[in-house]
Amino acid sequence: MIIIGEKLNGSIPSVAKAIADKDAELIKERARKQAEAGATFLDVCASVEEDVEVETLKWMIDLVQEVTDTPICVDSPSAKSCVAAIPFCKRPGLVNSVSLEGDKIDRIFPVIADTDWECVALLCDNDGIPDSVERRMKVFHGIMEKAKEYGIAPSRLHIDPLVVTLSTDETALTVFACLLYTSPSPRDR
């Protein structure tokens, strides 16, 4: 199991304030604490306007790398920002995320293909989160085909099945159980 520290996200009010105020100490402290707690990757998500996102990601990534060697998880809804942030990282990390929605997978996979970068893959497409096991498996296989096309080993992908909560969808548990049952073990890939 991998643990992704998610406390360096501009959608968190205290982090948003630190970004706006250029409070380097808060960013460093959050990075240090998550690394000490055993995070495998530290997710860095600026959650700012796209015209300043890349420079904000660079600032945050540089601060994180001053205090820890824990690999970075580059996180943005923008493929352009993710791709631009990869060179700021001192070592390969994780891109969060691709799916079959839009063209993000075709913009990120070529960049990480010949590297040791890993990637979170969300099981959704242009129709949203699949509501059946069959549709989720179709999306899963589509992502795996794209990975194969770009020469990305399955072991470099971390599949997020996007399980919806039981409080919003009573079939959620059944869908997740079926996904687990029908998915090949990583050892079998």
Feature annotation, model-predicted:
Residues 5-28, 130-132:
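Active-site mouth loops of central-metabolism enzymes
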Residues 30-42:
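Catalytic domains of carbohydrate-active enzymes, especially glycoside hydrolases
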Residues 34, 85, 159:
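Conserved, mostly hydrophobic/aromatic
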Residues 39-68, 164-168:
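Glycine-rich, proline-tolerant flexible connector loops at the mouths of alpha/beta enzymes
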Residues 45-47, 71-77, 93-101:
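Catalytic beta/alpha-barrel core
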Residues 51-59, 77-82, 101-111, 174:
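Active-site-adjacent beta->alpha loops and helix N-cap segments on the catalytic face
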Residues 102-168:
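Conserved anion-binding
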Residues 181-188:
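Conserved small/polar residues in nucleotide/adenosyl-binding loops
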